[in-house]
Regions:
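Hydrophobic alpha-helical transmembrane segments
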Residues: 1-35, 39-40, 46-86, 90-94, ...
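Amphipathic, cytosolic membrane-interfacial segments at TM-TM junctions
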Residues: 100-116
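Residue-level signal for inorganic ion chemistry
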Residues: 41, 96, 113
Length: 148
């Protein structure tokens, strides 16, 4: 009786990885990740009015951040505070979608998760307002004093 070699027996336990088995690598993987990211942004735009409003605000504030006479670090803080709101809104929307996928019934834990997501968006908005107020407030005050 001939016994199979260890390489043969291990290959039967786990089939060898073949190209095209659903796993992508390299640039192709990055391309598909970007496509999924785009799909998430489009779905959130379509389903969430708050996200649409925040994107409209970002479209106004981001160019202003790059036109303000501030340091590079302050410019990054201004832009990051705007993008933070969008990031947290995307995460909040994903939490809400996952909970709604599980069940539309009211449940204390589902409500708590949605409330925490909403609170996170509020905290991000407060960070944005504080950042813009601290950096741009003095500049706005100087401009108003000079022109009024």
């Amino acid at each position: 009786m001939v016994r199979p070699s260890t390489s043969q027996s291990s290959s039967k336990a786990m089939p060898p990885s073949k190209p095209g088995n659903g796993k992508r690598s390299g640039l192709l993987r990055g391309f598909f990740a970007l496509r999924h990211s785009r799909d998430g942004i489009v779905a959130t735009w379509r389903e969430e009015s708050a996200f649409r409003q925040e994107v409209c605000i970002a479209v106004v504030l981001l160019p202003i951040a790059f036109l303000m006479p501030v340091t590079s670090a302050e410019r990054v803080l201004l832009a990051a505070s705007v993008l933070l709101v969008l990031l947290v809104e995307l995460i909040n929307s994903s939490i809400e979608a996952a909970i709604d996928r599980i069940s539309l019934e009211r449940h204390e834990l589902s409500g708590r998760a949605k409330d925490c997501g909403s609170a996170a968006v509020t905290v991000a908005l407060v960070i944005g307002v504080m950042t813009w107020s601290v950096i741009c407030g003095p500049l706005a005050w100087q401009w108003l004093r000079a022109h009024l």
